[in-house]
């Protein structure tokens, strides 16, 4: 297999390193802006050179972002080349266009490293779907948020201090918005739900709330009451269709999620026959992520393409009623659903997920967490 590697950053360099001594996978091109010297590899900025080379059968997209990543991926598929990517934002955003194009052109596409880094989560979901119905998916999908919340819980740190530590260690970007506002997790749970349920979720119907507004006083109150706060993703089958959302969640001490440390991920599925099973590991990093890119390349060599067919676009309906801890919001609606006071916040009576997320849009300084 001759591959063209798009991008030579953290993941791209990792893929190059892991394929260097393989006889079945050959990096023929690297497309990047940097001036790097790689023995036996053509380093270029001219993507048309790759598209015109019929000996290149697979493109590995490791650039990140939406553009030009999607433009390059789309052009590769239209040129009859297989594609592997670790780019969850691109795969999620263009899912409705991507899968039909892959099918039309008769090429193979995989994106295992897009969710869970080195865990192999999407591959496992594809295997599960061969045998049975997946009932629900979700869990801790973002290592940055888990590191921040873990340090706030274990060390009593303020949010800003825990975030700065994560940035110093390379777990958080200089601009951490995609992580702490839940967008990274949102992309991942939508991709996971699409694969698990064989649909394409309408992204506008999947609400998301992050951890940006959490304070040390919240965490102290949770700890006192036997809870640990985690950013939890949820995708599930319901009696009326499908539900999907991302929100901080208070996990009882008895829950496995409550004990996931540092920047690790724990992602879970429940099957009708297999029951509840979880995958645990590093959700990011050069070699864990590159490892699953290479695993995808090996699957392409075996003729294995995407994990599941897509039956069409569906809307998520999040009418499940949960109790929520809320701090920072104050209006007549919140007062009407308040059941009790917890420290500086309140706890609601059970309210629908969609309803409280719609209310939250007008409360920019509010912190919200579901209670299990």
Task: List the predicted regions and their residue ranges.
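Glycine-rich adenosine-cofactor-binding loop
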Residues: 2-17
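NAD(P)-binding Rossmann-fold cofactor-contacting core
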Residues: 21-39
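Rossmann-fold NAD(P) dinucleotide-binding segment
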Residues: 45-86
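Rossmann-fold NAD(P)-binding glycine/threonine-rich loop
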Residues: 70-74, 88-126
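Oxidoreductase and adenylate-handling cofactor-binding alpha/beta cores
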Residues: 119-134, 145-160, 187-201, 296
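Catalytic, metal-anchored helix/loop core of enzyme active sites in primary metabolism
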Residues: 135-138, 146-149, 153, 165, ...
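Substrate-binding/catalytic subdomain of NAD(P)-dependent oxidoreductase enzymes
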Residues: 161-259, 264-266, 285
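A conserved regulatory-domain signal marking ACT and ACT-like small-molecule sensing domains
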Residues: 297-299, 303-372
């Amino acid at each position: 297999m001759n591959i063209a590697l798009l991008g030579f950053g953290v993941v791209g360099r990792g893929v190059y390193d892991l394929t260097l001594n393989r006889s079945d996978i050959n990096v023929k091109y690297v497309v990047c802006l940097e001036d790097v010297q790689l023995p036996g590899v053509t380093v270029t900025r001219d993507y048309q050179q790759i598209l015109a080379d019929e000996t290149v059968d697979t493109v590995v997209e490791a650039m990140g972002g939406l553009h030009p990543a999607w433009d390059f991926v789309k052009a590769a598929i239209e040129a009859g080349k297989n594609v592997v990517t670790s780019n969850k934002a691109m795969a999620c955003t263009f899912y409705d266009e991507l899968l039909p194009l892959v099918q039309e052109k008769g090429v193979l596409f995989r994106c295992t490293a897009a969710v869970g880094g080195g865990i192999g989560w999407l591959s496992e979901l594809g295997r599960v779907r061969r045998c049975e119905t997946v009932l629900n998916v979700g869990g801790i999908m973002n290592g940055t948020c888990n590191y921040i919340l873990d340090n706030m819980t274990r060390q009593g740190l303020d949010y800003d201090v825990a975030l700065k530590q994560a940035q110093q260690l390379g777990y958080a970007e200089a601009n951490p918005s995609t992580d702490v506002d839940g967008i990274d997790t949102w992309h991942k749970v939508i991709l996971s739900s699409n694969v698990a349920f064989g649909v394409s979720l309408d992204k506008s119907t999947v609400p998301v709330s992050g951890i940006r507004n959490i304070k040390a006083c919240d965490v102290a109150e949770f700890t006192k009451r036997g809870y640990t706060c985690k950013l939890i993703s949820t995708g599930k089958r319901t009696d009326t269709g499908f539900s999907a959302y991302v929100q901080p969640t208070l996990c009882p001490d008895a829950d496995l999620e409550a004990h996931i440390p540092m920047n690790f991920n724990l992602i879970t599925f429940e099957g009708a026959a297999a029951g509840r099973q979880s995958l645990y590991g590093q959700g990011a990093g050069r070699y864990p992520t590159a490892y699953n890119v290479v695993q995808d390349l090996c699957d392409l060599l075996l003729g294995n393409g995407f994990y599941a067919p897509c039956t069409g676009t569906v809307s998520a309906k999040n009418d499940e009623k949960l109790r929520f801890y809320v701090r920072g919001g104050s209006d007549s609606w919140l007062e009407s659903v308040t059941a009790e006071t917890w420290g500086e916040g309140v706890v609601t009576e059970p309210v629908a997920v969609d309803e409280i997320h719609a209310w939250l849009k007008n409360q920019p300084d509010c912190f919200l967490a579901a209670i299990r």
